[in-house]
Amino acid sequence: MGDMMTNSKLEVLTPQNCQMIFIDHQPQMAFGVQSMDRQVLKNNTVALAKAAKVFNIPTIITTVETESFSGNTYPELLDVFPGQDILERTSMNSWDDQKVRDALAKNGKKKVVVAGLWTEVCNNSFSQCAMLEGDYEIYMVADASGGTTKEAHDMAMQRMIQAGVIPVTWQQVMLEWQRDWARKETYTPVMDIVREHSGAYGMGVDYAYTMVHKAPSRQESEHRTLAPVPAPVR
């Protein structure tokens, strides 16, 4: 019982106890992803970024060989964090760049939520070294990360889990941060993320808002609804 009471990995994620790092969400890296649909990957990554912004999670964005190979980070991700410094690297392992280590230390949170490309390379090596050398706890966002094959992604996730990484998904992380729907200061922004990024769940929320609670539809443009006009039937 004593060990369980002192096991910090049993704690839920909160806005106060964690930080976030996005690793190499760049076009050339995304081109190689075969473990999941790449548009879904991008959707999930941007949704996670928006959630981190809502809850004021200290966030790091790092990139590799932007000009010579990988290309610019998803614009939709960067737009969530205007003015954010981007930590450029040459190393595959983010831990091998001193700027990244310094940023992690400055944020002062031992729980690190990680999303990146590719799972079997940059995510795996960073996680192993950050746990071993930095004593960080790693929460790997499986559906905002991708590998060159499904097997590569799955095996990398298994290796990391065996080493002590905690696997999570983007919506799981966001809802752990929210925790209680009575927290009204973040309720509406969280539901906006759900409506835009959570697929069928989001469509269901849209339906409930507009058809049950009679809230206005969320599109920004105006549209007329023209009444039915039956055509002649012969």
Model-derived regions: residue spans:
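Active-site acidic carboxylates
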Residues: 2-91, 106, 137, 154-158, ...
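Glycine-rich phosphate-binding loop at the start of an alpha helix
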Residues: 46, 98, 120-124
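Short, ordered loop/turn segments at secondary-structure junctions
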Residues: 64-65, 91, 143-146, 172-173
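Acidic, metal-coordinating catalytic cores used for nucleic-acid/nucleotide bond scission
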Residues: 66-70, 92-94, 119-123, 149
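Distinct, well-ordered alpha-helical segments
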Residues: 70-77, 101, 126-131
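Short phosphate-binding loop-to-helix
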Residues: 89-102
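Glycine-rich phosphate-binding loop signature in dinucleotide/nucleotide-binding domains
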Residues: 104-110
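A contiguous pocket-lining binding segment that forms or flanks enzyme active sites
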Residues: 110-170
